[in-house]
């Protein structure tokens, strides 16, 4: 070790270099994720890992950003409150029966249990979000089974995809916040809510089309059909994640 490195100034310089390196890798990773779908996955699999942060790190950073935006905007995309489960979700009838039985078992009332559930589901939504990425990987195995890609390819692809999805949701929440600031209705408008959902799914489909072409080298026509199915899979996993959070939180809170 050089004498310069043992001084305070030398230590500070090393810290600055380290953080600059992290920042540059992060920005390079984000730029590649948003503008070159699939390129990060290909680079990782080809061993080009030093210029970028690892897939799990990128996913976790996107997760932190998303839930920070969700908290700032008081939105509940994943951390669905109990009242919404009981009245506004496709499984609301089933949820009403499950919640009623749980209240009896806990010897409590809906009014007392609701804040407990809402607090717990918000925490669970943050810590378990990786389950969505893991659930998507088997869909890739089925869709591209003839490509004989290792399981790790599908896992890395899924982590990058859901990092993109979380950033997409973060951007949507930011736009909604600006809209509300200037007097717009936000998600209170059913039309805007549905339009935004369609736009997000289209963006996801475009990403999948480009990314699967880069990673799996699929022909155009077949790729379109598979992307449609995979996009439906993304939407189904989001709904499935919300329902899973209901069950996990209901029987643990």
Each model region followed by its residue ranges:
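Membrane-proximal intrinsically disordered regions of secretory-pathway and membrane-system proteins
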Residues: 1-253
